[in-house]
C-alpha cells in the first residue's frame, strides 16, 4: 500500500543517543595548577588516580560507584566516561 519501495530515513533523535562514548584521561598524579592541587569532586579526599569527567576530576572509586547507579555523573549530569585512556608517563627523569 502506498510507497512500499521508499526507504525511511533514520530520525535525528536516534542519532543523538548512539554517540560513541569519549575516552576519559587517567592521571596517576594530577597536573599542578595555579590554585593548588586537584581533588576528586565527589569525595574531596583522593588526589591520585583521577579521571577527567567533563569539567572536573573523579577518583576511580567514586567513578565506579556512579557507574553502578546510573550512566550520568551526579555532579555535572553529563554521561560518565566508560573507557579510560592511560597516557604514557615517564617512570624516571630524563638524564
Curated annotation (Swiss-Prot):
Gene name for this UniProt entry: Z
Biological function: Plays a crucial role in virion assembly and budding. Expressed late in the virus life cycle, it acts as an inhibitor of viral transcription and RNA synthesis by interacting with the viral polymerase L. Presumably recruits the NP encapsidated genome to cellular membranes at budding sites via direct interaction with NP. Plays critical roles in the final steps of viral release by interacting with host TSG101, a member of the vacuolar protein-sorting pathway and using other cellular host proteins involved in vesicle formation pathway.
PTM comment text: Myristoylation is required for the role of RING finger protein Z in assembly and budding.
Binding partners and assembly: Interacts with protein NP; this interaction probably directs the encapsidated genome to budding sites. Interacts (via RING domain) with polymerase L; this interaction inhibits viral transcription and replication, Z partially blocks the product exit tunnel for the releasing nascent RNA product. Interacts with the glycoprotein complex; this interaction plays a role in virion budding. Interacts with host eIF4E; this interaction results in eIF4E reduced affinity for its substrate, the 5'-m7 G cap structure.
Annotated keywords: Host cell membrane, Host cytoplasm, Host membrane, Host-virus interaction, Lipoprotein, Membrane, Metal-binding, Myristate, Viral budding, Viral budding via the host ESCRT complexes, Viral release from host cell, Virion, Zinc, Zinc-finger
GO biological process, one term: viral budding from plasma membrane
Organism: Tacaribe virus (strain Franze-Fernandez)
Pfam families: zf-P11
Lipid biosynthesis in keyword set: no
Membrane topology annotation: Lipid-anchor
GO molecular function terms attached to this record: RNA binding; zinc ion binding
Note: Inhibition of host myristoylation by the compound DDD85646 leads to proteasomal degradation of protein Z (and not lysosomal), strong inhibition of Z-mediated assembly and budding, and reduced levels of viral replication and transcription.
Protein family according to the UniProt entry: Belongs to the arenaviridae Z protein family.
InterPro entries for the chain: RING_finger_Z_arenaviridae (IPR024183), Z_RING-type_Znf_sf (IPR038485), Z_RING_Znf (IPR003224)
Domain of life per record: Viruses
Positions of N-myristoyl glycine lipidation: 2
HAMAP family reported for this sequence: ARENA_Z (MF_04087)
Protein name: RING finger protein Z
Region Disordered: start-end pairs: 1-25
Polar residues composition bias: residue spans: 1-17
